[in-house]
Amino acid sequence: MRLFSVVLAVFTLLLPSQAFAQRIKDVASIQGVRSNQLVGYGLVVGLPGTGEQSPFTEQSFRTMLRNFGISLDANTKPKIRNVAAVAVHADLPAFAKPGQTIDITVSSVGEAASLQGGTLLQTFLRGVDGKVYAVAQGSLVVSGFGAQGGDGSRIVVNTPTVGRIPNGAMVEQSVPTGFANGDTLTLNLHYPDFSTAKSLADTINERLGAQPENGYVIAKPIDAASVRVSAPRDVGQRVGFLATLENFEFTPADAPARVVINSRTGTIVIGSDVRLLPAAITHGGLTVTISENQQVTQPNAFADGQTAITTQSIVDVDLADSRMFKFEPGVTLDQLVRAVNEVGAAPGDLMAILEALRHAGALRGELVII
């Protein structure tokens, strides 16, 4: 409980009250210059009996042998406990060239117990267009492990059915980009905001000597997310132009007043501009505890009876004392958090209070629950 109070207070106090200068490269990206997702299906071999015997794994195994010129009789059922069917995925960076290597992630798609010690055989990685952009192969690095006893007991640490192969795929072809096309480039903000888009365009025009008053502009905001920038046609000059442009510093607009709640972990992040309207709050907690004890009833030694097991249930209800808080106009959520923490409230209590304040219209800010 005390840890929650300290961590939440730190989150609240460290949030800046004013925006600060940032580089363009840290707040925006170039439209069309991005990574691409690749995916493939393959087989991992060499497992120490931790593979699987599923139908699709057997079918894949037969297909692999057929490609190597080996045919199995249809009635022959191979024992392949050292083989596992896997899905392979990777991100192909922008401008990746043939011959370069990328990291890949390998995940079991069947009932394999572990991929520890396995080797991925040649697997084609395809893009959304169905074309092969990389080929993967290599020995897996698996951080997790598992063990199983003869009675069915089992222990698993981390995730032994997922592994990685650093530099495990070789790029076969590049993905075309529109970087060198046209007379303009478009910068897309990571967090769309009209004020930030205008400030970004004004900074570029000022630093590059544009004269908006005479109708000569280099950067022009398109909407809340994008700024169009005139750029040289020559590829070499365009690279140098962007190298200079992306290091310009400007001051983005203040972030919107927002409260973000992760209901699964109890994490609460509060923006510094969030305010409360006058409100009175009361919140009480009802705790119900149910415990069960097994009791054995034993008959007398010479009595004609049987031993019986009965269950005794104990239900305990604890209604915590509730307190009312009254806040004046303009109170920050930091003050609300401190008031709630003083009575030892749990993260769930604060979540309920914040949601109730939003429904009452007293929370001046966006409430986001993830």
Curated annotation (Swiss-Prot):
- Disulfide pattern: none
State the oligomer form and interacting partners: The basal body constitutes a major portion of the flagellar organelle and consists of four rings (L,P,S, and M) mounted on a central rod.
- What NCBIfam families would the database entry show? PRK05303.1 (NF003676)
The record's section on InterPro entries has: Flag_FlgI (IPR001782)
Q: Which organism is it from?
A: Alteromonas mediterranea (strain DSM 17117 / CIP 110805 / LMG 28347 / Deep ecotype)
What does this gene product do?
A: Assembles around the rod to form the L-ring and probably protects the motor/basal body from shearing forces during rotation.
- Protein name stated in the entry: Flagellar P-ring protein
List localization entries: Periplasm; Bacterial flagellum basal body
**Biological processes per GO annotation:** bacterial-type flagellum-dependent cell motility
Gene (name only):
flgI
Q: Which residues form the signal peptide?
A: 1-21
